[in-house]
């Protein structure tokens, strides 16, 4: 947001060392009282003259309620000044994905109570299902979920992200037709249907579906499809919501007719879905997203290899210091070959293979020998199990290290690609969805 000209007052809801996608992190969650206290400090210094607010991940219900109170207070202040369009709340209802919650269960009803105060919400497909209580399985159920959100909560603007439907299009083109009658499948041109005309390669796609309601709370829906990049990234949701805030404001201010003075920046009912500021903003946001993600993915393999080499060297140094391998014939009972390779096979000392015998004519020596053999076998079995456990643990740690290296390599390369944020080339256009 700062790179696009916004003065930002960041109020953290968590203090984590890194993105939770790393599967390990340190830090603390900010309490509701701390959030309230920080905002009180801003007000005391007259630093609460905000035009917009973006709220994202809030881990607990009390903290979420505190964030909601801040937003409601800012909206009430704008209303009291007689300038309802002077404050705009973008709410990303972060609750879960792919059918699973990653917040506490009591967070869901709090979001259901807050979305009615938001101007724009950015749920993913799973979160839209939670809020609308409509299972999204195809385009008709998706448009029904949008209608419910408009009608039940009076949410002015909605963008549903990461939409993937069974009947969705698998071919993406920047020249797709502008109308989608209840389905995301593109209509083929006569040339495409003609004899001998080659078809474009079929590519897995994702979509975002957006809508701005009319004065009667009816949807004006559109869809933007784009090719999915088969790669894991850290921070895409945060990037999308931040860009939507900036580009929505930009699109509204570029619209004539005093839209900036209207509550929730709602366009006239006569404005077509494809001409909505929301649609224009989403096109530009996805252009930036696709460029940055593509450039991040291009260098990811090399970054993983460099990180792996660095970690391997560090592990070798630590092992050399711990085991005393350098200049020693063996370490911790493991044989070291001429090439420096540590042989992890169990080594038995000569004393362990010595059998006791007697010459007094009885069988005590044989019995002692049998017991010794049993002890040797037990010791060998114990060491074998220890070695197997050590190897399994090493495999687990190796997979963990690889995930951490991939996660680091998957961090979005934002600073290196500022031009993609500021001046993206819009390639994927919105298409109208006819809602029944």
Model-derived features: positions:
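Short glycine/serine- and small hydrophobic-enriched flexible loop segments
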Residues: 242-253, 287, 291
């Amino acid at each position: 947001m700062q790179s696009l000209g916004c003065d930002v007052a960041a109020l953290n809801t968590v203090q984590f060392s890194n993105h939770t996608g790393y599967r390990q992190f340190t830090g603390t969650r900010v309490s509701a009282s701390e959030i309230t206290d920080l905002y009180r400090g801003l007000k005391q210094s007259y630093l609460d003259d905000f035009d917009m607010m973006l709220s994202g991940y809030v881990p607990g219900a009390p903290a979420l309620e505190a964030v909601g109170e801040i937003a409601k207070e800012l909206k009430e202040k704008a209303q009291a000044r007689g300038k309802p369009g002077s404050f705009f709340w973008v709410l990303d209802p972060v609750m879960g994905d792919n059918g699973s919650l990653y917040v506490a269960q009591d967070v869901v009803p709090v979001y259901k109570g807050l979305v009615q105060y938001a101007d724009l919400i950015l749920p993913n497909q799973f979160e839209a299902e939670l809020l609308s209580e409509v299972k999204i399985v195809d385009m008709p159920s998706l448009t029904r979920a949008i209608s419910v959100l408009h009608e039940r909560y009076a949410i002015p603007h909605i963008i549903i992200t990461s939409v993937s439907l069974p009947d969705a299009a698998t071919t993406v083109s920047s020249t797709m037709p502008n109308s989608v009658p209840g389905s995301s499948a593109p209509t083929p041109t006569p040339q495409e249907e003609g004899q001998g005309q080659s078809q474009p390669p079929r590519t897995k796609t994702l979509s975002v579906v957006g809508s701005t309601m009319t004065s009667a709370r009816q949807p004006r829906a559109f869809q933007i499809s784009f090719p999915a990049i088969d790669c894991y990234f850290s921070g895409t949701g945060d990037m999308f919501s931040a860009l939507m805030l900036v580009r929505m404001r930009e699109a509204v201010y570029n619209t004539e007719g005093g839209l900036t003075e209207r509550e929730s920046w709602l366009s006239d009912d006569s404005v077509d879905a494809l001409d909505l500021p929301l649609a224009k903003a989403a096109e530009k946001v996805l252009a930036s997203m696709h460029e940055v993600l593509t450039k991040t993915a291009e260098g990811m393999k090399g970054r993983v290899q460099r990180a792996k080499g660095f970690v391997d060297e560090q592990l070798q140094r630590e092992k050399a210091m711990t085991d005393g391998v350098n200049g020693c014939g063996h370490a911790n009972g493991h044989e070291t070959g001429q090439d420096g390779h540590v042989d992890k096979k169990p080594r038995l000392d000569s004393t362990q293979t010595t059998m006791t015998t007697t010459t007094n004519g009885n069988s005590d020596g044989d019995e002692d020998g049998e017991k010794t053999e049993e002890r040797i076998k037990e010791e060998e079995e114990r060491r074998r199990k220890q070695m197997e456990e050590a190897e399994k643990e090493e495999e687990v740690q190796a997979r963990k290290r690889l995930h951490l290296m991939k996660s680091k390599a998957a961090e979005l390369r934002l600073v290196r690609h500022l031009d993609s944020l500021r001046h993206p080339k819009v390639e994927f256009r919105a298409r109208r969805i006819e809602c029944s």
